[in-house]
Regions:
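Transition-metal
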Residues: 1-151, 211-235, 258
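Double-stranded beta-helix
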Residues: 144-167, 196-238, 323-333
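Ligand-binding loop in jelly-roll beta-barrel domains
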Residues: 102-107, 116, 126, 137-140, ...
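His/acidic/aromatic-lined binding-pocket segments of jelly-roll/cupin-type domains
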Residues: 99-100, 108, 130-133, 171-172, ...
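Short acidic-glycine-tyrosine-enriched beta hairpin
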Residues: 169-181, 190, 290-313
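Short beta-strand/loop turn elements enriched in aromatics
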Residues: 134-156, 247-248, 265-275
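C-terminal amphipathic alpha-helical segment
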Residues: 206-276
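Short beta-strand segments in beta-sandwich/barrel cores
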Residues: 267-268, 284-290
Length: 333
């Protein structure tokens, strides 16, 4: 067996009508003349929907080491519990997280993912809890998360049918360094001018309720009114958590935990985890992953790269952080 080592993953770029060019600032090689909305940093999906992932499988390729050119799924097969620890694959045997960067040049559609009750009654629907970490935001950029106080299911239905959904939604400023966790069932949309790092459960089930067709002269797409009304939660979403200096826990769900790490010209011991540790390097002027014991060769990293550290190595990994280094750590298990 090939000895385990941290896996640097190749991005999978997704064209979106609402996308832009800001992913280039994260080192993504964007094709000319095409708006790119998403960079799938970690994906292990045997299939996707046409609107979400293009209708094809999405499996991240490995960029470094002896497994270069193979997929993360291949590494799961080869290393088993050495990679996964106590973390369980999905029901289809895939990695239990989907990790992305999103560049919203325009507003994204207002949508909702299946509620626990809906998913329990529909075998083809899956929960999708997600967390947005705001990497950057233009002045005045906003997020649409949940509803204004007092909004009811009847109010939502009337707003969907009259094309006035934004009027009943809660709009909040997009603040760099803030993390917003959206339990499945939260009606939401990213606003224009926001660049986010997103960690989520690997579901592609989405019900759309508003698509900004008039605001952006977009072609009309199907709305999923009945499903959305059945799934929508009218509870107040969790308050955002803002990352301060050092290490800040910014999300803690039943599916994953997230920590924001800020360092400047320092060697940082990464936390031990019972499952694999995913690291998104959102800002750096130079960084590397090293082994305290010498168990793997040092790996140079650049801004925007995403790495999976096998569970067995999490207590041994050190981040050598250059100037102004920010990272998001996502753990499972």
């Amino acid at each position: 067996m090939i000895d385990p080592y941290p896996l640097v993953l190749e991005p999978i770029l997704k064209p979106k009508v609402w996308g832009g060019r800001r992913l280039e600032s994260l080192g993504k090689p964007l094709p000319a003349g095409e708006p790119i909305g998403e960079s799938w940093e970690l994906a292990d999906l045997g299939s996707t929907t046409a609107s979400g992932g293009g209708g094809e499988a999405a499996r991240s390729a490995i960029a470094n080491g002896p497994l270069a050119g193979r997929t993360l799924h291949d590494a799961m097969d080869a290393w088993g519990a050495v990679l996964m620890g106590d973390a369980k694959p999905t029901a289809s045997g895939d990695f239990p997280l989907l990790v992305k960067y999103l560049d919203a040049r325009e507003h994204l559609s207002v949508q909702v993912h299946p509620s626990p009750e809906y998913a329990a009654e529909h075998s083809d629907a899956h929960l999708k809890t997600e967390s947005w970490y705001i990497v950057d935001a233009e002045p005045g950029a906003e997020l649409f998360v949940g509803f204004k106080p007092g909004v009811t299911k009847d109010d939502l239905e009337a707003a969907i049918r009259s094309g006035t959904v934004p009027s009943v939604m809660r709009s909040i400023p997009a603040v760099p360094g803030a993390c917003h966790t959206l339990p499945s069932g939260t009606v939401h949309a990213l606003g224009a001018g926001v660049l986010v790092a997103e960690v989520q459960t690997p579901s592609d089930t989405t019900f759309r309720v508003y698509d900004w067709t008039n605001e952006y002269d977009r072609p009309e797409r199907e709305l999923h009114i009945e499903q959305a009304l059945e799934c929508a939660s009218f509870d107040e979403p969790p308050a955002p958590i803002v990352a301060n200096g050092g290490s800040t826990e910014i999300a803690n769900t039943e599916f994953y935990r997230m920590t924001a790490l800020k360092a400047h010209c320092a060697a940082v011991d990464l936390p031990r985890s019972s499952g694999p540790l995913v690291m998104m390097l959102t800002q750096t002027m130079g960084a590397a992953l090293a082994s305290r014991s010498g168990g793997f060769q040092e790996i140079a990293l650049e801004r925007g790269q995403t790495t999976v550290i096998p569970a067995d190595l999490t207590g041994d990994a050190i981040l050598r952080a250059g100037p102004n280094t920010n990272a998001i750590l996502a753990s499972i298990g």
